[in-house]
């Protein structure tokens, strides 16, 4: 909600409230609500993802953003966000897998083959996450992923 607040406010101000007051038609209200959302999605969608879905839709090549269908924009936006989520997830995964490898190799070198490495590495992973202020870094990277 933090990222979308200006867009939701604009949709409420230009679409919902005028419609509830009877000043505009339902079609105009829907257009006024969708416009800020489209603007947000265009700003966040990678050009390559948008091009992929434009090509898959077999629609004529759009001249500008207003020519791109909302039904084409939404999946492109979702794919862009999923790509960002996977990148963030991978960056979190790397230090954890390093801890797993260090703990597993240490246990093997000590001859403790029957002790599951997860029992030892999990507290180290939690400790690392807490010491580097993981929640702060995670939320910051999520917010910074929005340009």
Where are these regions (language model features)?
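Hydrophobic alpha-helical segments and their helix-loop boundaries in membrane
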Residues: 1-147
């Amino acid at each position: 909600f933090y990222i979308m607040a200006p867009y939701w406010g604009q949709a409420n101000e230009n679409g919902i409230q005028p419609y509830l007051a009877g000043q505009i038609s339902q079609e105009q209200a829907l257009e006024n609500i969708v416009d800020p959302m489209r603007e947000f999605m265009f700003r966040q969608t990678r050009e390559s993802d948008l091009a992929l879905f434009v090509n898959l839709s077999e629609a004529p090549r759009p001249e500008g953003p207003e020519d791109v269908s909302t039904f084409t924009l939404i999946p492109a936006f979702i794919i862009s966000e999923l790509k960002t989520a996977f990148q963030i997830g991978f960056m979190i995964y790397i230090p954890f897998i390093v801890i797993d490898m260090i703990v597993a190799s240490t246990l093997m070198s000590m001859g403790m083959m029957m002790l599951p490495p997860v029992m030892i590495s999990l507290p180290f992973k939690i400790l690392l996450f807490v010491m580097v202020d993981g929640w702060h870094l995670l939320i910051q990277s999520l917010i910074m992923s929005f340009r």
